[in-house]
Amino acid sequence: MFNKSALIGSLLRRSFGTTNPLRQAIKNHQPNEMEKRFLVWSGKYKSQAEVPAFVSQDEMERVRNKMRIRLANIMIALTVIGCGIMVYSGKQAAKRGESVSKMNLEWHKQFNELKPEGGAAAPASTK
């Protein structure tokens, strides 16, 4: 059923081929300008001039993940702020006596007044 030598061979290849120190030692990724900014913003380097020409793929993955998380947190904060602004705006409109149903009734009233008197008009919907 099981081929022990194939199983052991695959486990050895998997453990030796992707060891963490070996993957970190291989610096084969050349960062572009945006990735250099990411490396600086994440605190890995002090300035873009200090960023080396090649960095490891693992380092770049970690930096991208940090930036993805930061961007998601910023979007969450902006969404919460936007919701708060909309709630405040709605409460102010309610104090002024504005409502969606009143705006809808006014629009229908204006629409019906502007409708031509001829028979070509669309039939009014009944509720």
Swiss-Prot record:
Keywords: Membrane, Transmembrane, Transmembrane helix. It is found in: Membrane. It comes from the Eukaryota. It is a single-pass membrane protein. The keyword Lipoprotein does not apply. The chain crosses the membrane at residues 69-88. One of its GO terms (cellular component) is membrane. PANTHER family: GROWTH AND TRANSFORMATION-DEPENDENT PROTEIN, UPF0389 PROTEIN CG9231. Belongs to the UPF0389 family. This is UPF0389 protein GA21628. The lineage of its organism: Eukaryota, Metazoa, Ecdysozoa, Arthropoda, Hexapoda.
